[in-house]
Amino acid sequence: MKSRTVIVVGAGPAGMFATRKIASAGYPVVLLNRDVKPGGLAEYGIYPMKTHMKQGLRKQFGKILDLPNVSYFGHMPVGANYAVTIDELQELNPVALVFAVGAQGTKKLGLPGEGCKGIYSAKDFVYHYNLLPPFSGMDFSTGRRIAIIGMGNVMVD
């Protein structure tokens, strides 16, 4: 086993599989994740009733977290405005820092009124029904009529 540690920030699919590859090369890996549970959108972005898909991913991720040279720390956001900064991670002198933080942003269409009350993004809604704080406590009030823009899996869910 190598002596110097690799720090991976983000435990979504990219971070998890990067961790597996790095750990299998013999490096100790410290895996830091903003959310309590690993998985990113694979955990919080899949409709809860799709249990087969979620369970399969959880099983794969569990095997990675069970590797003897992997240490997982959830609820550890990294960045300038958080308890752990990038500078502090660099001070630990890791052999490498890997950032696999995903793309949680919401795309805007540029339509008039899309910022009004009662307009919700799919991301916020999916996080809500997967109970990811702070989205789990959001009130998704609607009027008598609704419109869904898009045709991906979230629309079907």
Annotate each predicted stretch with a short phrase.
Residues M1-V9, R20-V30, Y47, Y82-N93:
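Rossmann-like nucleotide/phosphate-binding core characteristic of flavoprotein oxidoreductases
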Residues T19-K21, E43, L109-G113:
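Short amphipathic alpha-helical segments
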